[in-house]
Amino acid sequence: MEPLWGIFATPLLYYAPLYMSSAGLSSTQIGLLGSLFLALSFVFQALAGPVTNRFGRKRTTLWADLISWTLPMLVWAVAQSFAAFAVAAALNATNRIAGVSWSLLTIEDVRPGDRPRVFGILNLIVTTCGLLTPLVGLVIARQGITPTLRGLYFAGAIGMTVMFVWRNKITSETLSGVVARARHKELGVMQSLRHSLAEVAGMRRHPGLLGITTFYVLTIFLEQLSLFQILFLERSLRFSAQSLSYVPVAGVVVTGLLYALVLPRLAGLPVGRTLVLTRALGLIGAVALLLVPIGNLSVMLLVVSLLGGATFLTQTYREAALFARLPTAGAANLYSAVQTLALLCSVPAAALAGAVFAASPRGLFVLIAAVCTLLFGLAVWLARREGHQS
């Protein structure tokens, strides 16, 4: 089912900064939209666990997807002002509820040992949809970015809606979801929220959860800082939209190789050691991006592919590492709490990135390299701590 989401979302999210720029938004405004999205995401993330428990994983996923993707797709298709993009961002922020319910719907009934592979498959499916990006790039080269993406947004609204309804028909509620829904059935959303907060307050009781939570938060912060990568490649390194369309294709190749060759080899390693490897790759890529020669397509694709591979591995193993430390009871609340904390800490990231990029595009990517250094150090600490505990 995921390709019906990915074939639209992958190119649209990739080209979104260029689309907003073509609509007349400045880099500062784009950054503000990112922070607005994160601030509202924080609110919806706080409600994600209670809502998911109250209405069930399956039902919550359907309605949250329709609100967070179908509706904003239609708004983006006609947006011509900062206000319109802000409305779309507000609607899209509700995907934090869908993110929790869908993750639980997907993973709760899967054996812990198989979870990294499941996350890897899902990431691979979405990344593979990047193969369509050059086709979008060709249309952009002929028709322009604004009309091309407007049409794709309209098509995306239709395609995603079909997927959401279809997926809802063929999935079943998880066993944990049935239990949680029964427990929260008589509670209102606010009562359920208070119940959830009581469980979250006991986070310290779960060994290793605070450490992996810190790692999780920093990776989300880093992803928000990286929002301007495509603008950096276009403006500072002078790559055309057609050249940039090959970036997702390179990402597909790297992700496929990682999934086929690397994930099986990492399966027997402790999670902490895999996080060290992924963040070492991320640090090398972040530094290398600062050294890419202007207009050198081959070097750029190599470096961005390295960064994409590091992101793929990080997203795969950070989720697996987090779920490994979550108790069966209250998983929805604690998973939602970790993401809520990540969003809270990341709210200023997009605005900060926009301000730094406006002042010095290269300066932003020096900052990103510094965050990558911090993440690598944290991964090493987590691996050592994991070794001592074992």
Model-predicted segments: where are they?
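Hydrophobic core of transmembrane alpha-helices in multi-pass small-molecule transporters
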Residues: 3, 83-98, 217, 298-313
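C-terminal membrane-cytosol helix-exit motif in multi-pass small-molecule transporters
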Residues: 158-180, 378-383
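Structural signature of the two symmetry-related core transmembrane helices
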Residues: 59-74, 273-288
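Central cavity-lining transmembrane alpha-helices of secondary-active solute carriers
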Residues: 32-50, 249-262
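Cytoplasmic helix-loop-helix junction between adjacent transmembrane helices
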Residues: 90-126
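Juxtamembrane intracellular "pre-TM" segments in multi-pass secondary transporters
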Residues: 173-211
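Helix-loop boundary and gating motifs at the non-cytosolic
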Residues: 1-41, 208-248
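Helix-to-loop junctions at the C-terminal end of transmembrane segments
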Residues: 44-57, 141, 258-271, 357
